[in-house]
Amino acid sequence: MKIMGVAKRHAIKLLRRAVGLPTGDLDIVGRLDGFENDVVHGWAHWPRQKGRRVIVDIFAGDVFVCERAADMLRDDLAANGIGDGRHGFDVKIPPAFSRGAKTRIRVRPVTDAPLELTASDERALFARRISRDDYLRATFAEAFDSERERAAPAAPQPSQKTELLFAPTPVSSPPPVLGEALCAYLDQNRYKWDLADKFDATLSIADREAFLAHYVEFYGRARRPLRIPLSARDIEFLNEGPTPQERLAPSRAMRLFAQTPGEDARDDERLAAIFRWAAFGAAAFNVEDCLIASAHEDALRHCDDADIPFPLSTFMKRFLDAHPMLRGANVARESERRAAYFAILLFAARAPHYLRFVPADWLAAYLSPRAGAAPFEDESRRLFGAGGVTIARWRAAIDALGYDDEAKRFRTRTPSGHRAHSAALPAPAGETVDIQLIGPFSRQLGIADSCRALAAALQQLDYSVRLCDFTLDYPNRIRADAVPLPTSPARAKINILHLNLEELPSAIAYLPDIWSQGRLVGFPYLEMPTPHPAQMLGLALVDELWSASDFTTQALAGHRPCHTVGTSARPARRRGRGAARARVYEDIAGADDFVFLASCDALSGAFRKNPLGTIRAFLAAFPNDAKVKLVIKTHSVDRVRAERETNVWRSIRNIVAECERVLLIDRILDDDEQMALIEGADCYVSLHRAEGFGYHMLEAMALETPVIATAYSGNMGFCDEQTAFLIPYRLIPVGPGEYPRTRGDQLWAEPDFTAAVDAMRAVFGDRDLRERKVAAARVIAETQFSTEAFARRLDARIEDILSRRR
């Protein structure tokens, strides 16, 4: 970690002082480390001012985004002797300001000379001095955009679905010991992210604290700028600490997430810590809307000199003093106090919770015209000229951030006191359609293909249909041919959430609350014969379930009404085996080679998809035949993180390196290439241990490619002895690390090795048998799994639902 040399910095400082130029920027060291996934990372430090944190202003282009204290602990800073290591910052750039990777990020430490952090730590030889007014003009000149900050329509009242997120968890467990049971959403989060063995909030208060600390710090920061769900009890628990006798005692949230003074600290030290948390710390954790204790709000709102016009509260005074460009004002003068109000209201346009610390009556007076313009508008014209910030545009800015200025609170709080992001979202505009389909349309994964198949079938029917792209928690790559779709739904008579059950609660938590007037249908895939605790809340939230296979229906029927509606294969454009092979196999297989193909998304699980088992069977079936090859098609191996999974892929790469008849394709193919890959193979192999449905097997049947498949799970809706070479199996326990959120009682199939070897040899050697199965399979694919057949099944179920509304 290289920073500008002390000698060079000192020489520049002496030169500037000699000619009367500012030197404040030379007292700061720091760097902009990078900008990735809309998060800006960096650090800034004042070596000569121990314990003081640098304040940084973050810009996207020329637009001010927010102000933060550089106070995040970074181990690399501590290891390199950079102060106490608490000098980092990371800020999520909200979508309203972001242009993705094209966003030009600027980070300016607040000092009396212009300074912008870069990848180096160099300083200019000369610098101009800036005044308070210059600073405010430069910071807020482009901050108010009428389009970006248009006032939002009122949010609807939270529905019963939203309230269910905060109900008792549907997962049965022993009664609490000394701790408390988590609400449904937080408990589901614990199971979803494989934290159940690490955290049990029911055991003790300390255990409850530990989970909530992890939830807010890691899950909450990852979700920024979305507001993660917190129950009213969670909020009360985290705000506990201050009492009528000790109103300045730190809250539990402060103790968990911030630096707090010791028990023998003076009141001024405690108040300073409360101010730092309220001004910067809570916002850094995205909890400023709910985790500032009410006793602390009262203390920060207090005015020592309440009898004078436009008095400054404790918060306002400390904010001015903490801010290098605002401190030093002569607040004994009313004009300076009015200017201070204006400065703080400008910052409140990016941090609306500041308004809770401004005296309410005087804030109203500042925004109200008396014998002319309001004081706000007077100060705006003085600072920005005739085209300055209007009160209407300022109100629109705070409204866009979900703050209700009349109620003096954020709209994220429900009438029950819970915190829900959906509660702050505006009521959706547009007509009520018959059917709304919500799912990860734009992603490169199986359920996205299923979304498109479902959409195609629905659009054949005589109903109004709206499609909505929902990709939260789907890290898969974006399809190159993805069609832009709305990401925010509106109202519908039937809402279909085509998501995995463990992802479904996130749709309720983070989408507008549109669920109260329509029927909510979940359309999940299930790979295990019983649902996992992470999937139980998803089941509780829906009114009914649709499934593509009887396997899923049987697994879920005891939890919600479940209807098998099936699905459809993508329309097959047959080009002939020779042309298909030339399209994608040109460099790896000749025209007269016999090619077995197995495929899987590496993020779908190497143990579940079992490519290594396929390789074992292939090499046992054909140990030496140079004209028989196996192609393993995958993608995203570089994104696999689980150790046991990476070990499997490392072993596969080793085999590929040592055996020229086993080939690996690790890249995303477009739909045309994928179809050619399947059609150009002589046999498609799926020795899976569990399968939600098995689209590639069905597509192989439609393309007249023989199929070898494990006789278990979702594919059995179209695989039988007439259509496929079925491999018998035995049920075995799912091993640790072999499947997400593995439980000891979960079972899946272990395909019979000898049968798999025999099936490969049969496909290769018995042409008549191969062709009989291919012909039968094609009939099934075209008659039962066409878009038209799928549409007919859907129509029957939809008509039944809508007829009950009439």
PLM ranges: what are they?
Residues 787-806:
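C-terminal alpha-helical cap of glycosyltransferases
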Residues 755-762, 769-783:
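A short, well-ordered alpha-helix in the C-terminal region of glycosyltransferases
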Residues 682, 704-706, 711:
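A short alpha->beta transition loop at the rim of the catalytic pocket in nucleotide-sugar-dependent
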Residues 449-457, 465, 573-674, 679-680:
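Conserved catalytic-core segment of nucleotide-activated headgroup transferases in glycan assembly
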Residues 689:
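Aromatic "clamp/platform" in nucleotide-sugar-dependent glycosyltransferases that forms part
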Residues 3-226, 237-246, 256, 260, ...:
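Basic, ligand-binding patches in group-transfer machinery
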Residues 107, 324-326, 330-331, 415-427, ...:
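Extended catalytic core of nucleotide-activated donor transferases of GT-like folds
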